[in-house]
Amino acid sequence: MANATMKKTKLAKKMLVVEDEGEMCLILDLILSERQLESDYVNNLLDADEYLQKNKPSAIILDNKLPDGYGVDFITYAKKKYPDTKIIMITGFGTARDVAMENGADYFLEKPFSLQNVNDAIDAVFAMK
């Protein structure tokens, strides 16, 4: 019971990862776990929307090309409904940077990226007010 109490009082930041590639989820899970961040994973935009209706993550790591649409299009919707949630856009398409940022992404990472790139992105969005 003591652990449950400790867990309730812990002010961990929670991340939602929206990514359909299993290997990428594993990599991100290792990074987020190392930083002692809580994280949940979904692999499409519909599940992301359902998750956001019930949970309030501090930030979202959002892939662009997903089975049911494009992350860049989801950014505008998510920012309207959940303006305080920070969004880190990740994609293998650097050309999506301008659209992602115009739509409200707080940070953009192009695949492939390094551990330091991910840590810099997380630090940057958590430093934002």
Predicted regions and their residues:
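Non-catalytic signal-transmission and effector/linker regions of two-component phosphorelay proteins
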Residues: 1-14, 116-129
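Two-component/phosphorelay signaling modules centered on CheY-like receiver
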Residues: 21-40
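Acidic, metal-coordinating helix/loop segments flanking the phosphotransfer/catalytic sites
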Residues: 41-59
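The feature encodes the CheY-like receiver
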Residues: 67
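Alpha4 helix (beta4-alpha4-beta5 surface) of REC/receiver domains from two-component response regulators
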Residues: 73, 94-109
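Acidic catalytic/metal-coordinating carboxylates
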Residues: 44, 70-73
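Active-site residues of response regulator receiver
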Residues: 63
